Amino acid sequence: MFSLRSLVDYLRVQRELIDIYTPVDPYLEIAEIHRRVVENEGPALLFHHVKGSPFPVLTNLFGTQKRVDLLFPDLSSGIFDQIAILLSSPPSFSSLWQHRSLLKRGLSSLGLRKQRFRPSPFLHQDAPNLLQLPMLTSWPEDGGPFLTLPLVYTQSPENGIPNLGMYRMQRFDEQTLGLHFQIQKGGGAHFFEAEQKQQNLPVTIFLSGNPFLILSAIAPLPENVPELLFCSFLQNKKLSFVKKAPLSNHPLLCDAEFILTGEALAGKRRPEGPFGDHFGYYSLTHDFPIFNCQHLYHKKDAIYPATIVGKPFQEDFFLGNKLQEILSPLFPLIMPGVQDLKSYGEAGFHAVAAAVVKERYWKEALRSALRILGEGQLSLTKFLWITDQSVDLNNFPSLLECVLKRMRFDQDLIIISDTANDTLDYTGPALNKGSRGIFLGVGTPIRSLPRHYQGPSLPGVSRIGVFCXGCLVLETSIQQINIPLLLKESHLEQWPLIVLVEDLSKTLSDTKEFLWRTFTRSSPATDLHIPVSHVTNHKISYRPPMILNALMKPSYPKEVEADEETKKHVSSRWDKYFS
């Protein structure tokens, strides 16, 4: 059985955790302390005295690359490379023998096992009081306190297949939480099935510090691959449970610090939000399902795990990158033709991705692009950049130059309007609605890219800069810019991509800022402006340049920012926290 206390002790020894004994408030104060520590690549934080709760709070468990590597040492040893080799090799005794340790790991560790305790490791509340939990309010305009690391377990009413996902939950009262289910993800699909049958959906929520459980809950696994099974494989041992929950028959995992059991109520919705999310903006108030908590279990010395999300880099960035690192050897097996793939956490992962693919025949790259956009959570990608060249996808400027040199505007630019969109992304015409853009750059270069702008001043543009060769960045505003007029500037045709932004200095300060400001503030169908060359056989052919309007639109939610009062309060107490 995993022990969070042992993990805390280990991180102390490694000087990767600091104990804070100064009393702190879960309303804004903890979040602001956490953000400052994350910004300085600091340690995990254990707050021992939290106002209004008997439970300590643990945050920033995953806040640096170093700490993530410490928490998952075995996953950096190439275990998924071995899986890829085994699965791609013709079956033979020698191959099986060579990978016998991997097979043994799979046979011995997969699944769950019941573990007997006397007494039980959990205390049980028949009349649960969620007000005792030190739920955090992270941003000043958040709608209330939230569970930010809930591991939400459901089973399909149709076939019983389980799902473990992470969906934020807003506390409404002693027994009720808002459940931010998204229809594109497993828990939301299960709730849809339950409502079709006019049934409540049994839901079990684990609050656990087990890094493998957390990693598994956010992993972009193929549909119907159980996350608990994946977790047991990652940690190389079965998950233990004490018993099955009343009514739902869900396993009560020993690795949890807190377990909430209850139901998502069919046909019932309640306004949830706002919430400062991992895109760095507030997701707005919308009606979402209601979770009614019927039982609350917790360890006697329970530690409440939490995270704070916001503008990158936060903990989710490092976890997401670790997942991509360990799963990357499997991409060519799951999606033949895809040699490398990266979603950019700098823009919240779903906004922009890139892939290196094979182009062995005409438009094979397009086939691979469509396959990527049909795969699980990757289907939420807005901007997808594709090349067949050997390029380091971690270097986005190099990737962008590689594509722009090769992209033929009459056939390599595909815009798909009216698609589903990430629920947290407000760049589309309505909630859950958006578009996709595929940008292909394969074969030999067809153009040289300019590296410096040497043209005249542009109407409505206050400053001009260059992100990388071929990508011009213009500082302007919604009120000043006239995009149709800009497209008539013939000297701009040599620049394949032109991005409109409010703040040139911030956008060009580093790659993270460019990715975040460009792709979280735009949608392919509504914000790409490209001259049309002609239309043939229902295919639109374009010509350069393409102007991407990444300006903040009036309909967009606000960027998250801490309030001045909280900043001053935390600054005045900073030395006390760490004395």
Swiss-Prot record:
It holds the Pfam family UbiD. GO terms for cellular component: cytoplasm. InterPro entries: HBDC (IPR022390), UbiD (IPR002830), UbiD-like_C (IPR049381), UbiD-like_N (IPR049383), UbiD_Rift_dom (IPR048304). One of its GO terms (molecular function) is carboxy-lyase activity. Signal peptide: none annotated. It comes from the Bacteria. Belongs to the UbiD family. This is Uncharacterized protein TC_0359. It comes from Chlamydia muridarum (strain MoPn / Nigg). The lineage of its organism: Bacteria, Pseudomonadati, Chlamydiota, Chlamydiia, Chlamydiales.
